[in-house]
């Protein structure tokens, strides 16, 4: 019986250790995600005019996947040194027109 209790205690300790490791990994992943997000915000703040930044944040509320794609593309271009001046609201509108999928126009013809 003592052997079974020891075995149970070892299992319990091992399970607790695994749980601690998993929690630590989750905390590290969350911290890494926060750092990446902070870097993205800093880069976008540096390359976007306030009006363009506001438009992008509104777009993020309505269409997060499109906003994320545009943000990633802008960050990539900035890191590659391909953006020479701040992006204005007008420039961002043009970028968004190119990125958004074309809508099919449905025409109804009545006879």
Curated annotation (Swiss-Prot):
The keyword Protein biosynthesis does not apply. Keywords: DNA-binding. GO terms for molecular function: DNA binding. InterPro entries: DNA_bind_arc, PDCD5-like, PDCD5-like_sf. GO terms for cellular component: cytosol. The keyword DNA-binding applies. It comes from the Archaea. PANTHER family: PROGRAMMED CELL DEATH PROTEIN 5 (PTHR10840:SF0). NCBIfam families: PRK04239.1. Belongs to the PDCD5 family. This is DNA-binding protein AF_2068. It comes from Archaeoglobus fulgidus (strain ATCC 49558 / DSM 4304 / JCM 9628 / NBRC 100126 / VC-16). The lineage of its organism: Archaea, Methanobacteriati, Methanobacteriota, Archaeoglobi, Archaeoglobales.
């Amino acid at each position: 019986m003592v052997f079974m209790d020891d075995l149970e205690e070892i299992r319990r300790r091992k399970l607790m250790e695994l749980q601690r490791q998993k929690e630590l990994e989750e905390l590290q992943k969350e911290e890494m995600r926060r750092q990446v997000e902070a870097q993205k915000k800093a880069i976008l703040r540096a390359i976007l005019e306030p009006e363009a930044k506001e438009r992008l944040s509104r777009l993020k509320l309505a269409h997060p996947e499109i906003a994320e794609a545009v943000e990633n593309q802008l960050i990539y271009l900035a890191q590659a040194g391909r953006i020479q001046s701040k992006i204005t609201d007008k420039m961002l509108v043009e970028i968004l027109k190119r990125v958004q999928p074309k809508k099919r126009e449905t025409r109804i013809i009545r006879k």
